[in-house]
Amino acid sequence: TGLHKHAWPETFKFEEIRLKRYRMGRGNFLDHVDVGSYDSAMRFLVLFVYLNDVEEGGETEFPELDLTVTPKCGTMLLFPSTWTYLHRGNTPISNDKYILGSYLHYV
């Protein structure tokens, strides 16, 4: 049982935790991946914690996966930072969206 020895790095750490605000009617983040530098590709997981509910808009959308995550207070979203997880932050319509975000990366 457990993860294969090559499935999880022996040494890793979180980057600083960022508080992000997406403003109602104008805050968004266009399609991107979160590997950081393509030369080093140190990041391997993305971590978001939604700090409030957004009734309309504000979703985190993965267009290539046909997946949309609606912001709900206290929900955590964890996904790989690589090119296969292209995503975007849609503009919140009903109210501002607040998230905590960080990345796990290799040391």
Predicted segment positions?
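Fe(II)/2-oxoglutarate oxygenase catalytic core
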Residues: 1-76, 84-107
